Structures are given as C-alpha cells and as structure tokens.
Amino acid sequence: MKKFVAFAGFALLSVGAFAQTNLQVFYDFGENRKHVTTTLEMFKSDDWGSTFFFVDYDYFNKDYRNEEVAGVKIHPNTYGARSSYFEIARSLNFWQESSLGALSAHIEFNGGVGFGSRNWLFGAEYFLHNDDFSNTFTFELLYKTFKGSESHLPLQFTFVWGMNNLLGVEGLKFSGFADIWGEDTYLWADRDKCESSLTFISEPQLWYNVGQFFNCPNLSAGGEVELSYNFAYNEGFMVNPCLGLKWDF
C-alpha cells in the first residue's frame, strides 16, 4: 500500500496543473513473504483539487506455487501476479486561494484481487508544509464503509509525510504513511475473528537519488519497512523490510 506521491504533489498545487508518476519495484524480505512487489503511482492536480491512484502487484514465488487455492493445487510453472490491490482518491478543493486552502474534501475507493474487503471512504484532509514545501505533512479523517468485512468503528485516520534532502543530503528523501482504522477481520491461523477491531499499517520509505551521479535523475534506490498490526489476516504486530528501486517518470 502506497500513498506518498499524492501529498508530495500538493507542494505544486499553487502553480497550476501538475502530474507525477513513478514505478517502484521491491523485494519483500518479511517472514513468509520473500516475493517481488511492484507499485505504480500517479498524482495529478488541477484547479478543483487533485486525483491520486496506485496499483500494487504481488508476484508468485516458489512457496506460493506449492499452495492450494479452493482445493486446486497451483501449477509449479505458474508465474506472474498473485494478487493486486489499488486505491484511487479524489480531493476536492475549490477554495485553494482562501484561508481554508489547506483543507480539502476527500473521497476514496480501495479494493483488489486477493483482498476480502472493498471500501469507500469519505471525509476531509488537512495539508501542512514548511516555507519551501520540502517538508510536508497531511492528516485525513475518513468515514470508512466495508464490503466483505465488518467494523464496529468505521473510521480511518491517515497520516502522510515527506522530507526532501534529509539531514542536508541532496537527493535523500524520507517519506511514508500510517493508517489506523477499525475492522473485524478473519485470521488465516484459526479463522476466528480477531478480538481487537483495531488495524494499523505504516510504510516508512527512505530513497536516495543515485541517478544524479550518472545523468539519470529519475532513478532512486532505497527501501521501506512495513509495520502492521492485525493487518491482511495476520494477528498481532509484524515487521516486513523491503529493498527496492524507484523510477520517476
């Protein structure tokens, strides 16, 4: 799950229409993971707000090809995408030049293949930044609907941050997000509902623009750490480190 570029792009809202797209390729070193994930992100601003989406694909590895799905064994030569997940969001802001320009209305849809729940989210977001927009922070408060799962607390809190040229190092960027919401989810281990309805996920990322040294400023190397609690059918706290490359189009 990624949502970094959407809020980095707010820094350029004041100069008119702006678009940004990037592709990230990760190898996940987490326990029982050991697979490749690709993420395509796009952000575009306009006079009425902004649009953002991302698509994640997780790919088959050796262990996945030994699994059974609905009682059918997966062919050992199966390759390609194993599951996918996407989010698309629209921020509405007709008052960008007013004193409330940092506050936007927000509508979002989450879903995918291999994920039990699909969600519509409605609410508001608030954007903060320093003078040159090199450091940004966004907070969202959203009402969350559930299709395929249930919730006794249908709210989501989202925090997104971006820090460019971290510690004064040109090309070093620290970004990330954290989502907290209520959802009663089933666990793979025992198929019983989790006692806690709180779900948390955060993915801090660190990127360094290695391409600046060989006339290829689009290329960055780095990684992320997925920190989660009661997320994706897993009970308790999990840490999944990843290494990757990113290409900014």
Where are these regions (language model features)?
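Short glycine/proline- and aromatic-enriched beta-strand/turn motifs that initiate or cap beta-hairpins
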Residues: A19-D63
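Cleavable N-terminal export/targeting peptides
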Residues: M1-Q20
